[in-house]
Design a protein with these regions (language model features):
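A short alpha-helical cap/connector motif
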Residues: 1-159, 165-184, 193-240
């Protein structure tokens, strides 16, 4: 969704985000009590501290818009908290704030992180090293994906967060991993749809292959919940 279209649809997205016109009980609850939740969670103070640390460490190295907003980091935490996965797959660490935010949900969860520049990123290390071996680092995306799915038990739903996609090779690897989830069951969160063409293309592929479940997006972040119990619906929202 381009900037002009986001502005043009702002009122309708804001209206829908209040629950108006949403008939699915699951979707209404998810929009109102997860995406739109305004009461603070226990991890919010830690998330704010991580973001402040990343901002200070990065200094003028990155444009301000490249650092995840505090609201989005909190939303990622709430989404993860709602589904409470025991195994998480995160593609791209950026500053490390998003990865730390989803890992903060459970001290028992294991996060499989594909971040080819982790060894050179002091801020990623600063934020993620305190989690110890509960964050497993990979510099090869295929190895990361394979290791993640080998740890998923038969009845567990995959949970995937994609922060960025570096090139066509990574896109192909993610298609092979993610599209089967879309056709079965699991949760996929894609960020930076408005900034990165490859992320937008993967999001379009996910929506195209979805036969059931629900998608939620504001044109910047997309959330796909693949669940055969849910009728296929697409919601354009004003996400916090």
């Amino acid at each position: 969704m381009g900037r002009f279209r986001r502005y043009r649809t702002a009122w309708s997205r804001h209206h829908r985000s209040g629950g108006f016109g949403i008939h699915s009980p699951f979707a209404f609850n998810f929009v109102q009590n997860v995406l739109g939740e305004r009461y603070p969670y226990y991890a919010y103070a830690r998330i704010a501290k991580w973001r402040a640390t990343a901002k200070a460490a990065l200094g003028g190295c990155w444009p301000h818009s490249s650092l995840i907003s505090l609201n989005e980091a909190r939303m990622l935490f709430r989404i993860t908290n709602f589904f409470n996965p025991s195994q998480l797959l995160v593609i791209g660490a950026r500053s490390g704030v998003s990865a730390a935010s989803v890992k903060a949900v459970s001290s028992q969860s294991v996060l499989h992180l594909y971040s080819p520049h982790y060894a050179q990123s002091r801020v990623q290390q600063q934020l993620l090293m305190p989690f110890g071996d509960q964050v497993r680092h990979y510099t090869d995306i295929s190895e990361c994906v394979q290791a993640y799915f080998s740890q998923i038990s038969g009845d567990a739903e995959p949970f995937v967060l994609v922060n960025e996609i570096g090139d066509e090779m990574e896109l192909d690897a993610l298609k092979s991993a993610i599209l089967p989830i879309v056709r079965k069951q699991g949760v996929i969160v894609l960020r930076n749809l408005h900034k990165h063409e490859l992320a937008a293309r993967l999001w379009a592929e996910c929506k195209h292959h979805a036969q059931y479940g629900q998608t939620y997006t504001n044109g910047k972040t997309g959330i796909l919940i693949a669940n055969p119990k849910l009728q296929l619906e697409h919601f354009s929202l004003w996400l916090k």
